[in-house]
């Protein structure tokens, strides 16, 4: 039996995390998402184009819950989406979300005058899959960790998107890439809209 693309994606994330534990500085320097502007600490630009994808495979070496919750979300939403649209489409949705999350993170916070360091984590892609799940199965019941109350997927996605927008604009819960999460949702919305377009003969 062939393993799902989502399971393979989780396995790659775990493998990269092991490398991060062994070589944290080198991995973050090369593969985290760094700002387009020079860093005030050293006056250097550390951004490279591949980072708009590779950052999503990195997670905090000092906080195991970072990778744990991201992989839980990836499995929870990704496997169900893959079951309906297939491996290539779920990967396209995920990586489109990762890229739009990165671009949003690079552009929006600096425009708001928010200083940026490096960005890591799969959460932009996971938020994208969350929205795709809500668009595909709006009435499916989900039980979030916070609050642990069953609710339809459309409401879950709406509440989380609203919270991310609120925290991003107000600056609350700093240290979390709120606009990247919203950017990931935009990417997946574009992909799902493309899936729904009628095919021309």
Locations of regions flagged by a protein language model:
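A detector for small-residue-rich transmembrane helices and their helix-helix packing motifs
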Residues: 1-201
């Amino acid at each position: 039996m062939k393993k799902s693309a989502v399971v393979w994606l989780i396995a790659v994330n775990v493998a990269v995390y092991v490398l991060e534990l062994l070589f944290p500085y080198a991995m973050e320097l090369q593969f985290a998402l760094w700002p387009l502007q020079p860093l005030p600490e050293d006056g250097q630009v550390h951004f490279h184009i591949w980072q708009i994808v590779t950052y999503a495979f990195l997670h905090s070496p000092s906080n195991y819950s970072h990778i744990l919750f991201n992989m839980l979300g990836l499995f929870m939403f990704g496997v169900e989406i893959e079951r309906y649209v297939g491996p290539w489409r779920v990967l396209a949705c995920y990586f489109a979300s990762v890229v739009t999350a990165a671009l949003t993170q690079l552009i929006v916070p600096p425009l708001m005058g928010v200083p940026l360091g490096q960005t890591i984590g799969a959460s932009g892609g996971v938020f994208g899959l969350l929205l795709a799940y809500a668009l595909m199965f709006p009435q499916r019941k989900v039980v979030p960790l916070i609050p642990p109350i069953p609710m339809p997927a459309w409401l879950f996605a709406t509440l989380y998107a609203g919270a991310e927008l609120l925290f991003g604009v107000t600056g609350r819960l700093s240290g979390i890439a709120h606009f990247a999460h919203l950017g990931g949702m935009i990417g997946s919305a574009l992909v799902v809209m493309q899936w729904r377009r009628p095919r021309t003969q």
